[in-house]
A protein has these predicted regions:
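N-terminal nucleotide/polyanion-binding subdomain common to many enzyme families
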Residues: 1-90
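Conserved beta-alpha
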Residues: 72, 76-152, 156-157
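Structural motif
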Residues: 63, 159-160
Length: 161
């Protein structure tokens, strides 16, 4: 994405910029209706990326932001460069604050049953974001279930998942 700097981490571009720069770019993308994916990468996700081809494919064309100290440390030691961390929970909260101001809606997907609903209540109260839907992440891996989940999310009209 424009205006961001990256470091190459084993073939994966990782954002170097601070959180304000990241939020500015994401805000601009939302303003023009641009579709994008963001992953906040910690050491565990970095390990999966390095060892699992499916993870490598999933992270292709994704804006990858350092989440944890472990990844930041590895980049500093291996590549002799510094990156700014932006933990996923903090990014999610900031995106909800942004969405609350711009009237974008959010669909919360993942975790165990009940967690997304509790998060939705908290986020709506704290940020004013409109929650388009919630769904836990525990489901059957069959294709019909996955298609149903995708349809539910798509029909929600959410701008942010």
């Amino acid at each position: 994405m424009e205006c961001l700097s990256f470091v190459d981490f084993y073939g994966l571009p990782i954002v170097k910029n601070d959180r304000e720069a990241v939020l500015t770019v994401l805000r601009r993308a939302l303003d023009v209706g641009r579709t994008f994916r963001v992953t906040t990468m910690n050491a565990q996700i970095a390990y999966y990326y390095l060892t699992m081809p499916d993870y490598q494919a999933a992270l292709k064309d994704t804006l990858v932001i350092p989440d944890g100290v472990g990844l930041s440390w590895a980049i500093r030691k291996r590549l002799n460069t510094r990156v700014s961390r932006f933990p996923g929970v903090e990014l999610g909260l900031e995106l909800c604050r942004l969405a609350g101001k711009t009237e974008e809606s959010v669909f919360l997907f993942g975790s165990k049953p009940g967690v997304a609903e509790k998060a939705a209540t908290f986020l709506a109260q704290e940020t004013g974001v409109r929650i388009a839907g919630c769904r836990h992440g525990f489901h059957n891996p069959d294709e019909d279930t996955q298609l149903g989940i995708c349809q539910e999310i798509s029909e929600s009209g959410a701008s942010i998942l």
